Design a protein with these regions (language model features):
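Glycine- and aromatic-rich loop/turn segments at beta-sheet edges
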Residues: 107, 280-299, 333-343, 386-388
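An acidic-aromatic substrate-binding cleft motif
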Residues: 251-300
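Aromatic- and histidine-enriched alpha-helix N-cap/loop-to-helix transition segments
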Residues: 125-128, 232-234, 298-309, 344-355, ...
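Short glycine/serine- and small hydrophobic-enriched flexible loop segments
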Residues: 312-316, 355-365
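Active-site acid/base region of carbohydrate-active enzymes
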Residues: 267-279, 361-388
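Terminal accessory carbohydrate-recognition/targeting modules of carbohydrate-active enzymes
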Residues: 1-267, 305, 316-320, 333-334, ...
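Alpha-helical support elements that line or immediately flank enzyme active sites
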Residues: 298-332
Length: 388
């Protein structure tokens, strides 16, 4: 039985289901975040947002989403859903009959006599999201159409149709590579079906509305580029895996990578296990430097006060790792010299260092060893307040 599950009556109720979200984060600083209907309601929502060093280490949303359609006997069923002002179109949520999230988000659709499932996996050690599509049952073969929606923007911003965007892609193994603007990395979109084809007919999907932003009174509309679409053939019992990645992948191995990725995550065993997983998801290891994300998906990584307040709870009592505690703390000290010892707008933030070190000692660390390593840091912090 799935640990997290929603039924059809809950899922087709937009007022209910749009407030429930999928949130996956990995060690590279990437995330996948959307509603359980895969209808984005906030500017931060999307299938793949990544941390880019070339832009100061901020997160950038590259792939906003993918709209799926099933074509059977010449009839097309659109499974996607977007908000345009007060209108939702297409209304693919009406086909959803089940949602579970153990160990990865799975959405099941029933279209006539067809049963179709979508599973989403964010790779844990690379900037890649994998989506597996399975035709569980069907009276006839089906064509699967996948339309990617590209953003290529900072997660805090919105984007609009403009003449500077490069709407063309380059053919790669099993798909296409897109780079909408200079200095961005390529976004490689590929599918595991060797016979699939990509129809390159770019157009802008305008005035997509993010309902949560609208409710808060923020800018809430943007335009997203649809560069074309994939067409794949599916038979009953068949599957295809879609990959969006900063690296070009071997498409023959996409199904194996998805299967091994799901296996590595494992099933959720209870609330404590789920809490530990959430704690671990807040700790990034981008470029081999561990830091704490202050909050997914809109807050930053490696903030002074937020790291000091949460460090002991996450690394010691959550993950039982003194080594991780010291590694994150050492990285914080190296990165926050100015705010620790000279100038900060959060006047109390450096003083949390004392609380954090005391938490470490209470956990079981040797107090003399802690003072030997971090005593000079505490002295420096206290002395920084002397000038007033």
């Amino acid at each position: 039985m799935a640990f997290i599950k929603f039924n059809k009556s809950e899922l087709v109720n937009i007022a209910y289901s749009l407030k429930r979200e999928i949130l996956c984060a990995n060690k590279t600083g990437a995330y996948c975040n959307t509603s359980i209907l895969t209808c984005n309601t906030r500017r931060y929502h999307g299938l793949l947002a990544v941390t880019l060093d070339r832009f100061g280490g901020d997160r950038y949303l590259l792939l906003s989403g993918v709209d799926e359609s099933l074509v059977v006997k010449g009839k097309q069923f659109n499974l996607g859903i977007h908000c345009y002002g007060d209108i939702y179109e297409p209304r693919g949520h009406k086909y959803i009959v089940d949602f579970s999230a153990d160990p990865v988000p799975q959405i099941t659709y029933k279209v006539g006599e067809m049963l179709f499932r979508k599973s989403i996996l964010l790779a844990q050690d690379r900037d890649q999201v994998l989506v597996k599509y399975e035709l569980l049952s069907s009276p006839a073969p089906a064509k699967l159409v996948l339309k990617p929606f590209l953003a290529f923007r900072n997660t805090h911003s919105l984007t609009y149709q403009n003449p500077d965007a490069n709407t063309k892609g380059n053919a790669i193994q099993g798909g296409m590579a897109f780079r909408m603007y200079a200095n961005f990395p390529d976004l490689n979109l590929q599918v595991s079906d060797s016979k699939a084809k990509f129809i390159e007919e770019p157009y802008w999907n305008n005035n997509i509305t993010y309902s949560d932003e609208y409710r808060r009174g923020f800018d809430c509309r943007e335009d997203l580029l649809v560069p074309g679409w994939f067409e794949c053939s599916l038979k009953e019992g068949g599957s295809v895996v879609f990959s969006a990645s900063l690296s070009q992948e071997e498409t023959a191995g996409l199904k194996r990578r998805f299967t091994s990725g799901v296996k590595a995550i494992g099933e959720i065993t209870g609330y404590r296990d789920q809490l530990r997983r959430c704690a671990d998801s807040l700790i990034t290891d981008h470029n081999g430097r561990k830091k704490i994300s202050a909050g997914l998906t809109w807050m930053y990584t490696g903030l002074l006060r937020e790291t000091l307040v949460s460090l002991a709870g996450l690394s010691l009592y959550g993950l039982d790792s003194p080594k991780m505690f010291e590694e994150i703390l050492d990285n914080l000290i190296a990165d926050q010299q100015e705010r620790l010892f000279r100038r900060t707008t959060q006047v109390e933030a450096p003083l949390y260092m004392a609380c954090t070190l005391q938490d470490y000692i209470d956990y079981g660390a040797d107090e003399k060893a802690v003072w030997k390593k971090y005593g000079v840091i505490m002295r420096g912090i206290i002395e920084s307040y002397l000038p007033g």
